[in-house]
């Protein structure tokens, strides 16, 4: 505490200690009381002014101290900020390059994949088209063959039917001829038998006539086979 402040405090204390001991006559002397009060007020005013100056000085010293510590701190913060900015810039640059490389690689792989599968799909589509064309041609060939076979089968059945009818007609004719032949053969045999019997009768009659004329006798077998 400053000497001026201690002096004002002692004066105020002294006046305060003196006030209770004032005699009742002091109330009858207002001039003395007013003078004493003015002294107290002046001392307090000086004390207030002194206290305000000291506070301003202390505030200035505090500001200087804060500024003294704040300058290195700001410098460190500025350096850290610049370092952080460089690190972030470098990191973002590296990240951007990495992302570009990844995107480029991915794009190249996707293009290669699309080209490979596009080529495979094109070849497969070409093969499917060729197979479908061959299948269509084969189906047309089979259809034509089937129609030809159907036509051939129909013609064969018609020819077979005609031949069966012809065979039936031949069989009927053969049976008719056979029947006629059998009938004619029976008649021929009967006619031949009748002719042989007539010849035998003639020979027997001739033999009988020869016997009558006293010819040497002959056996019946000699007569039959002569």
Curated annotation (Swiss-Prot):
The family assignment reads:
Belongs to the XLR/SYCP3 family.
Coiled coil, from the record? 155-210
| Expression sites (tissue/organ) | Expressed in lymphoid cells.
What protein is this chain from?
Answer: X-linked lymphocyte-regulated protein 3C
Read off the PANTHER family from this record: X-LINKED LYMPHOCYTE-REGULATED PROTEIN 3A-RELATED, XLR/SCP3/FAM9
Biased-composition ranges, Polar residues, are 21-30
Q: Pfam families given for it?
A: Cor1
Question: Would the keyword Membrane be found if you checked this record's keyword annotation?
Answer: no
